[in-house]
């Protein structure tokens, strides 16, 4: 970290609990659920889905919060901004952040609001693909007054979760955070989050990335959706003209690193996959950890692949085991 910065990464995202459930392929068809993406659902729909499945695990989640959690376990100084209700689920979420020594000061949802803390029902099919059904709840009410200027100003990186574009108030909050970051020379990383999310907000995303992003995280489907191309290589010139660096994950193929006019594939080791939830979030953790150590972009991507590989072998979006050995090897 530079002398005037107190934090390595501060993130803004959807604060919610993840409920992981194993289901069959026919279940998704019967319930009309689009596979492999994030489906926005109402509280009623969320409750109805839960009546039909048997949860395997319940854990604090949210894409950016998952990234921040792993960064904290890697020893980085982190902060998080996201809205929860003052309820049991919100208490679990907040407790997990505090346990990981993450700075979290966002006020609870106003007591006059009946929404509960957000919940994401993650349906895992036999091929280990995850399909998310997200009730946003309290997180939808994140607004510009929740943006902690000091937290962002004193951070090396601001990490923005694309899912938060699903809401006008939180979109305003994003732009306020970006303004603060630019004013204080805080670098900006943005994750595209989901191909359907990109479809909903393509124009806004492209403008945001072109004008503000120092680093973009995405997967293959999200990148193709963003630039409306059939192959990710076709996006190279569009990226080179506007964005300094894009790290694009491609499942077992590893990751593609777009930097200026070059494109490189960084391979990954094969692992026994149990659940793909949180793989992209943890890739971002490894990459940002590498940047904090001033590693090359290629090594950052390799570390991203390694950390993503760790979470693929467990249920849920977060690594629970100690990362001490990883830190020793990559100090």
Enumerate the language-model features and the residues they cover.
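Glycine-rich phosphate/adenosyl-contacting loop at the front of the ribokinase-like
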Residues: 1-81, 91-92
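Conserved phosphate-binding/catalytic region of the ribokinase-like
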Residues: 1-10, 15, 29-35, 52, ...
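A glycine-rich helix N-cap at a beta->alpha junction
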Residues: 96-114
């Amino acid at each position: 970290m530079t002398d005037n910065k107190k934090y390595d990464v501060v993130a803004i995202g959807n604060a919610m609990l993840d409920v992981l459930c194993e289901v069959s392929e026919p279940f998704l068809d019967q319930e009309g659920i689009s596979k492999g993406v994030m489906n926005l659902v109402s509280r009623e729909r969320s409750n109805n889905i839960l009546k039909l499945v048997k949860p395997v695990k319940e854990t604090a989640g949210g894409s950016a919060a998952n990234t921040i959690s792993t960064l904290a376990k890697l020893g980085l100084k982190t902060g998080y901004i996201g809205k929860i209700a003052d309820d049991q689920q919100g208490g679990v979420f907040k407790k997990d952040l505090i346990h990981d020594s993450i700075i979290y000061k966002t006020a609870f949802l106003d007591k006059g609001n009946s929404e509960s803390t957000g919940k994401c029902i993650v349906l895992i099919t036999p091929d280990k693909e995850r399909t998310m059904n997200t009730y946003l709840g309290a997180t939808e009410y994140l607004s510009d007054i929740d943006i902690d200027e000091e937290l962002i100003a004193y951070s090396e990186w601001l990490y923005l979760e694309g899912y938060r574009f699903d809401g006008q108030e939180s979109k305003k909050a994003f732009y306020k955070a970006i303004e603060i970051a630019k004013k204080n020379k805080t670098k900006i990383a943005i994750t595209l989050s989901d191909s359907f999310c990109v479809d909903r907000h393509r124009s806004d995303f492209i403008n945001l990335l072109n004008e503000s992003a120092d680093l973009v995280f995405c997967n293959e489907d999200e990148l193709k959706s963003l630039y409306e191309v059939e192959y990710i290589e076709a996006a190279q010139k569009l990226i080179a003209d506007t964005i300094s660096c894009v790290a694009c994950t491609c499942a077992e193929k590893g990751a593609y690193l777009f930097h200026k006019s070059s494109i490189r594939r960084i391979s990954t080791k094969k692992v026994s996959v149990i659940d793909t939830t949180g793989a992209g979030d943890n890739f971002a953790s490894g990459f940002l950890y590498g940047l904090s150590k001033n590693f090359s972009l290629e090594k950052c991507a390799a570390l991203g692949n390694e950390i993503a590989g760790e979470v693929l072998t467990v249920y849920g979006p977060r690594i629970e085991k100690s990362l001490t050995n990883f830190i020793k090897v990559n100090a």
